[in-house]
Amino acid sequence: MSYPLFLCKKNSDFMKVEQIYTGCLAQGAYYIESDGEAAIIDPLRETAPYIAKAKSNGTTIKYIFETHFHADFVSGHLDLAEKTGAKIVYGPEAETGYSKHLAKDGEVFKLGKVTITVLHTPGHTPESTTYLLKDEVGEPYAIFSGDTLFIGDVGRPDLAQKKGHLTAEDLASWLFDSLRNKIMPLPDHVLVYPAHGAGSACGKSMSKETWDTLGNQKQTNYALRADMTKTEFIEAVTDGLLPPPVYFSANAKLNKMGYESIDTVMARGAQALSPDEFEKIANETQALLLDVRGKEVFVKSFIPNSIFIGLQGSFAPWVGALIPDLKQPILLITEEGKEEEAVKRLARVGYDNVVGHLAGGFDAWVNAGKEVDRVETIDVDTFATRYTADLNLLDVRKPGEFDAAHVKTAQSFPLDFINEKMSKVDIKNQYYLQCGSGYRSTIAASILRARGFDKLINVQGKFNDIAAGPIPTVTAACSLGKS
């Protein structure tokens, strides 16, 4: 979705800034326009929206500014530059496998009647850069802070570690200096436009808000506390970091070295396959069967050995967390009309090898008389009637959610690390699976079922509803002691 245009504070027509926010990635790209020229900051992989916007406004895309080598999505800088002739700009320390302008700290770029100044702000990564937008009279208006500064948080400092050379503590030290020397001295009225909001794995405790004033962040963001020492800062930003999703390093490499054109990826994924063709490819190759329909229809029945990750949830991050090989051939099962969206959203996180989709969707498979499978699914009320202290309950929520509150007898089995946790479960046992809403438990059930577990019961419903019922639960503070 796109947020409304945020016009400059003087309400004149020399500049406009639009945040283009993609909820499933919790990612913000930016369109800046002034006097017939436009710049895009941290674009997503699909380039059409930016090109269409510039064409509609009668502007030329002059620059593509990248704040760093993104790890959680594949940026659209290469395709956008190829199609528009715009110059790709990175800050210092960004060595790439393609042509770009390597800007110096303090370098100024003119865009129409405004300017954009490079502020090298290493810490999240060595090349991390913040871009300072100044208005027609040279007054600071906004910063595009990438993963250096979020609303309520800062970027995690562990993604660019180099064993024996660069530690998370080293990067956190740089981040402290970047914030104090480059960002905090700016005027309080300056707007902060980060690359991510709540839900991204690039930080720990981001706000649901996606922009703010720097002055308010100085008052509310723990990392900008004026009296915080560097030691305190390093401890705060490195404490409690979960391992990054497995696809992060691969995405960062694609952004650094280059990737296949999105048009080629979309064309390959557009291949429609009959049920017989789909089955033949599935049987003869190592293709992964990925079902992206809604969980409400998936739980009724699905193609044997298919994995569920529904488009309606945090699709791309879960794909990245659960499918370790970006080159994995993928066959799609979608709702009719959702084929292109599925291919596009996979490409956003570097999964470019979709080899086709089931023409006519799951109904075509059923109508062709093909085999189907299902996992028993129950609601919260039914679960309450079946619950006993000795049943095997897998809570697939994140460790922090589990620690905050969980069913007393549940085993923490976080979906993020299901591949690593397989040795903790016995294929002979019966397991109930539960999460916060039913989306993640359905993903987990599909993965376990594809690996031969046939005694699974998927609990659909909110954890809060489970906690409100008779089943004993434990919170971080105490046991709720229900019987």
Question: Locations of the language-model features?
Answer:
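Active-site metal-binding motif and surrounding structural segment of the metallo-beta-lactamase
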Residues: 47-89
